[in-house]
């Protein structure tokens, strides 16, 4: 890697660490505040346990805002960098962990576990989930035309889920976080990921179409009609299954 690619690698590592740490601390704050909500149940805890939890909360109140702020700033830096240049993010040493980090954090902010980030006073901790979600989505959009990135997301079997992106779209629309053009671009990106994921599965089964032999990416002759079918599927499925996801930005989410 050249010097700038090394810098990009450090930025991705910093975002990964700071987001994981800050969201984990928000979840801890949520858990302690939830315990304290019932005065009767809290009073039933042992004095030592209450002291320990209250001390942990004071410590989190002291240190979490700084880490959350750093996390937000590094995500914003990532958004700005990916808007200006793509190539350094596409090197094999970076693109896979970048895709996994983005998928994971999208899940944390817009997936079922987002309710764990709901705290009594998010402003106190410098936590703005709308801004974080908007910036992470923008990174996806900035890289959405890069074949290496599409492939990296398609290969992220642990974190990538089509339903998560569909749920994110519902949040973006409901909260008017981004424009309809950007939402359509995000849905088109999901179509590309789904198409390539299917192709990769066929390759794994030895059933890849002949025109894909010897190439790691998709061929326009196959993908254009395939994406048309996928878009139709997305349109049909868009209203299904969302009631099973506790979206952030709803009554049970962090805002």
PLM region spans:
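Small Cys/His zinc-coordinating "RING-like" fingers
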Residues: 213-253
